[in-house]
Amino acid sequence: MGRSFYHFLMTYRDPKLTDQKTEFANNAYRDHSFPKQTRNYHILCDYLEFNAPYLPGMSIFDELWDAYLLDEEKNKH
């Protein structure tokens, strides 16, 4: 079993960059209620839609979710 989406997202953290993916990662890090252990797309979507005003649009999450799935598949073997 691989890592959670949160742990994947943390690879995008950087205090000096200001692109949307990095800002999402930095804000999720500061969000103490973020579902850190889940690998479930629907749980993450529901949480972000209702509890993450720092995410300007779900397309950022969707891009990172796709990258997460590719990374999980690559590291499966």
From Swiss-Prot:
Tell me the protein's name.
UPF0346 protein lmo1857
Q: What is the lineage of its organism?
A: Bacteria, Bacillati, Bacillota, Bacilli, Bacillales
Pfam families assigned: YozE_SAM_like (PF06855)
Family classification: Belongs to the UPF0346 family.
Q: Which InterPro entries match?
A: UPF0346, YozE_SAM-like, YozE_SAM-like_sf
